[in-house]
Regions:
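C-terminal closing repeat unit and adjoining cap/tail of repeat-based domains
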Residues: 3-5, 318-435
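Structural motif
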Residues: 85-91, 130-133, 222-225, 265-270, ...
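Beta-strand-rich domains and repeat architectures in extracellular enzymes and scaffolds
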Residues: 62-88, 107-121
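CRL adaptor-proximal regions
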Residues: 1-30, 37, 162, 434-435
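Surface-exposed loop/turn elements that mediate protein-protein interactions on large endomembrane-trafficking
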Residues: 89-105, 134-151, 225-237, 268-282, ...
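Short helix-loop-helix/strand-helix junction enriched in hydrophobic and basic residues
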Residues: 32, 46-66, 93
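A sequence/structural signal of beta-propeller blade repeats
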Residues: 108-315
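Tryptophan-centric aromatic hotspots in well-structured domains and transmembrane helices
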Residues: 26-27, 32, 76-78, 121-122, ...
């Protein structure tokens, strides 16, 4: 791997035509201090556009970034690949403006990547060799995480001629915390591995901060492993026999802990700050396994919430859609779940992204008390890579759905995901990229 510095956004990075100029006006002569103040009020995708109009505007754009006055409450975007664009270009559809923005990503081409997460303005992707790459579309910074073969239950496989041939995925015995010698490993190609290694990926912080821990939820049996940016291997969380069957993870900045939800609704708090991970049971749900996807979310007031997502198949079993969503508050005093129909004027975004709330009063184009969803079911995506992809809003008050974002040129691979653009906190970042 080689060390490179992140590049600034230039005309080559944003492929959007500038609007025609007004006769008699030279907008390049707009005073820099006024332009910088204007840039501070714009959504980040619009700042992309402004920064490539001309040299003087680009200089003001760089100064606005340096001063840190760009929006710290960016609106939501749907990121996807468009059939009428180059494979390296990512489309950002802003729900705030209704516009599409086009950003050329660093190699490997965006259309070959599998989006497995988004957080802190970074997309979390896996390439065709199943390597995990963190990339910031705004700064073009890219960071490579430890290779898949350093995950506890993954080994590189050789064929009969001794040539590297893919991955072997082993079952782990939770009682012995070791390989299950009686179970045959699953043979995976280089590309197939990413569907098994990254069911969920969560960041503790902006990766450019130098203090970011990355948590992955992986098969078999929905295990958790973590690594810090710059580390060489993944550490398996195997504190006890309960460390499996996880569905989702979040990071809480306030107490610097990860919170993970299991298939039966149990919630575990996980401390990765010391030499060895420490686990504490926050909620013992005492439920049997319920057949739905479960998300764990932190509200603005600091409450832990669970979202249970039920699916069904439609159109002759060709399309998998959400049938219902139920939101619960975790009552840590009574140790029970309390159903919510009102999320207090917010909209909630779930999918491969780290779940987040937005105040509808700040983004009036959103619908209050609604859950905005994208597809994130790995086995369905694996078996139907170019099939239907759900992008919808579920309205809690009347249990109805609204389909979002007309398909147009939108492709279903990589799977569309929610994303909030952001600039790295550091203006210059040293990051690892694959050579």
């Amino acid at each position: 791997m080689e060390q490179v510095s992140s590049s600034s956004v230039t005309g080559e990075l944003l492929e959007q035509e500038a609007p025609p100029s007004t006769p008699g006006l030279d907008w390049s002569q707009l005073p820099a201090d006024l332009l910088i103040r204007i840039l501070g009020t714009l959504e980040i995708p619009d700042i992309f556009s402004s920064g490539v109009v001309c040299r003087s505007w680009h200089a003001s754009y760089l100064e606005a970034r340096r001063l840190g006055i760009c929006s710290n409450n960016p609106g939501p975007c749907l990121v996807f690949s468009s059939s009428d664009r180059d494979p390296s270009v990512a489309t950002l559809h802003s729900l705030t403006t209704g516009k599409d923005y086009y950003v050329t990503m660093p190699d490997p081409p965006f259309r070959t990547r599998y989006i497995v997460g988004s957080s802190h303005g970074w997309l979390i992707t896996a390439d065709e060799r199943s390597n995990l790459l963190l990339v910031n579309p705004a700064t073009q910074a890219q960071i490579a995480m430890p290779p898949p073969e350093t995950i506890a239950n993954v080994k590189i496989r050789c064929n009969g001629e001794g040539m590297l041939d893919g991955y072997d995925l082993f079952t782990m015995d939770m009682s012995s915390r070791d390989f299950d010698d009686e179970a045959e490993p699953i043979d995976l190609s280089w590309e197939e591995g990413r569907f098994y290694f990254y069911m969920r990926v969560v960041l503790s912080a902006d990766p450019s901060s130098g203090n970011c821990t990355v948590m992955i939820l992986h098969l078999l049996h929905n295990l958790l492993s973590f690594a810090r940016v710059g580390a060489t291997h993944w550490t398996w969380i195997n504190v006890n026999e309960l460390c499996w069957n996880y569905h989702d993870v979040l990071y809480n900045d306030d107490d610097r802990l990860f919170y993970a939800i299991r298939g039966n609704g149990d919630v575990h708090a996980i401390n990765t700050n010391g030499p060895s991970p420490i686990l504490r049971v926050v909620l013992d749900a005492k439920n049997s396994l319920i057949n739905c996807a479960k998300y764990i979310v932190l509200s603005e007031s600091g409450d832990l919430l669970q979202v249970w997502r039920y699916y069904h198949y439609v159109n002759n079993n060709k399309e998998r859609r959400t049938r219902e969503l139920v939101v619960y508050k975790v009552d840590l005093v009574e140790h029970k779940l309390v159903e919510l129909k009102d999320i207090e004027g917010h909209a909630l975004f779930i999918g491969f992204n780290s779940s987040f709330f937005l105040r509808v009063e700040d983004f009036p184009m959103l619908t209050t008390n609604s859950v905005y969803c994208t597809d994130d079911t790995v086995h369905y995506i694996y078996h139907s890579r170019f099939g239907f992809r759900e992008v919808s809003a579920f309205h809690l008050e009347n249990s109805s759905f609204t389909d979002l974002v007309p398909i147009g040129s939108r492709l279903n691979w990589p799977p569309p995901a929610w994303f909030r653009p952001s600039y790295s906190k550091e203006s210059k970042v040293l990051c690892c990229v694959t050579s």
